[in-house]
Regions:
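The feature encodes the CheY-like receiver
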Residues: 14, 56, 74, 86, ...
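Active-site beta3 strand of CheY-like receiver
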Residues: 44-50, 55
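Charged docking surfaces used in two-component/phosphorelay signaling
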Residues: 15-23
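C-terminal output helix
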Residues: 106-116
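Short hydrophobic/Thr-rich beta-strand motif most characteristic of the beta2 strand and flanking loop
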Residues: 25-32, 40
Length: 128
């Protein structure tokens, strides 16, 4: 089963992502700040990290850089999931090592499509 770490300090976003992904047989972990995200990434080694830029302690850009600099964690996929939607924001996210960039508000269908693109054969719909 694919494991996804959601890093966001907005409970509504975390809940939306959790509901969207758990319905598709994806295990979801959560972190509300950068330090917790780094700890959980090291402990659980998720396949994918959905990472907000604006976190209360360490910025999402710094978390992304640290994950990509760690040889044991560098292969995990990272999607910046953030309201920062300017061209410069996107460039900074990708320069920090993010594999993709998804702006808020986002469509759950677009999120699933992006997860499937980055993690092929991950999404499996539960029977009705």
């Amino acid at each position: 089963m694919t494991t996804v770490l959601i890093v966001d300090d907005e409970p509504n976003i975390v809940q939306l992502v959790r509901i969207t992904l758990e319905d598709s047989w994806v295990q979801v972990l959560e972190a509300a700040d950068g330090a917790t995200a780094l700890d959980r990434a090291a402990a659980f080694r998720p396949d994918l990290v959905l990472l907000d830029i604006d976190l209360p302690d360490v910025s999402g850009l710094e978390v992304c850089r640290r994950l990509k600099e760690d040889a044991d964690l560098a292969k995990m996929k990272i999607v910046m999931l953030t309201a920062a939607a300017q061209r410069e924001d996107i460039a900074r996210g990708l320069a920090a090592g993010a594999d993709e960039y998804l702006t808020k508000p986002f469509s759950p269908v677009r999120l699933l499509s992006l997860v499937e693109q980055l993690m092929p054969r991950t999404i499996r719909w539960r029977p009705e």
